[in-house]
C-alpha cells in the first residue's frame, strides 16, 4: 500500500549560518560520530535567492573516511575551487550518437575555466551487462551473442562519431575489452557463479566506453580533453548494507597523482565505478553515477554540480499522479534529501552529503530543453539577519509497494527486549524498516518495509 511522508531527517539547523549533518560512520568496527569545525567564512550570493558559502562556519557529523582533514592537496599541483564546474550526464543523455554530440556541445560551450564531466553508460547498457552475467551464471551459451550485441552497439556509435586515429584507437580498445570480457564470462560460465568483484568489473565497462567516446568527440572540436577511469582515483570502502563509503583522504592522494600525469582543463570521468583500498574494482551500486559526480565535486571543490537529465527539474509531486505538479525553482539540501528519501525522483539521498559539506549547489537541468532553468539545490535561504527562513510545503513524495507489519499480543506489555527481538528478526532477512509505530499500551508494534 502507498505511504506518503516527509519526515524530519538528521540534518538540522544549528546557529545562524551553521548546519549539522548526522550520519553513521565507521572507525574500526565501531560506529562513531566526528564533529568537524570549519573556520569562519565569507558568504556570497549564488543564483536567485540561493546562498553559496565559500568559507562559512559549519559543523559536520560524518564518517571519518568521508572528509579529508588536511589541506595538503590544496597546495599541490591540482588546482581546486570555483574554477571547476562538474557536470553529470546519465545514460539517457548519452543514449546514442546524436545525444553524445549534444552532450559534447554543452561541454564545449560551458565557459567555466575547468570542467569535469561524469558520464554513465549508454542507455540500457548497464542492464545488458548484468544480463550477460546472469546468462553466464545460468550456463546459457547465449551470453556470447548478447556480448556481441553490446560490442555492435558501441562499434556502430563510434563509427557515427569518430574517424581517423581516434576511431582506430577506440575500436582497438573496445575489441581488447570485449576479448577480456569473453574470458571472464567463460570463467563465470564454468563456475556457475560470479563473485561481486567479478560482476562489478564486467558491469563497469559501459562507463569506460562512453567516457572514451565523449572525450574523443570533445577533442574533435579542438579542445584538450582527457578521459579518466575513476577506478584509478575514487576509493570507496564497502559496507555491510550493500553500500559504499567514499574514502576522501585516499581519493585525494590518488587524484593528485593522476592529475600530475594528466594535467588538463577538461576531464571526462566514468561514473558508477570505483576501487576498494585493495584496488579491487567495485561500483557505487544503482544510481551510483550521481554519487560519483557529487564525490568528484567535493574532491575538486567545484563551484557547481549540474546533473543533466530528461526532465525540466524537480517537480513538487509526481506529475503522473498529480496533474497540477510544478517545477520547483529552488530546494534546500534538507528538502531535497527528504524528498528523495521518501520516493521523489530527485537524487539518491547520499548524493547530497558530499556537496553539502562544501556548500556546492546542485542544479538539475534538462539536456533536451536547454531553455528551462531547472531546479537549484543549495543551502536554505536566510534573511538579512542570518536566520533561516521557514518555507511553506515544497512538495509531496510517496513510496509505493510497502508492507505494513503489525505485531500484537497482550503478553508483550512490560516484557523487556520484545522490540529488540522483532527487529533482530527483520535484520536477519535483510529487510529495511522505514517506519515504526508503537502503541502506548505496548500491546502492539507496527512497522513498514519495502
Range-by-range predicted roles:
Residues 2-352:
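Nucleotide/pyrophosphate-binding catalytic subdomain
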Residues 2-9, 25, 41-43, 373-450:
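A conserved regulatory-domain signal marking ACT and ACT-like small-molecule sensing domains
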Residues 120, 228, 269-271, 308, ...:
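Generic beta-strand/beta-sheet core signal
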Residues 122-123, 232, 311-313, 362, ...:
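Glycine-rich beta-alpha junction loops
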Residues 164-170, 347-350, 359-371, 407, ...:
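Flexible, glycine/charged-enriched surface loops at secondary-structure junctions
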Residues 289, 332, 365-375:
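Short flexible/disordered coil segments
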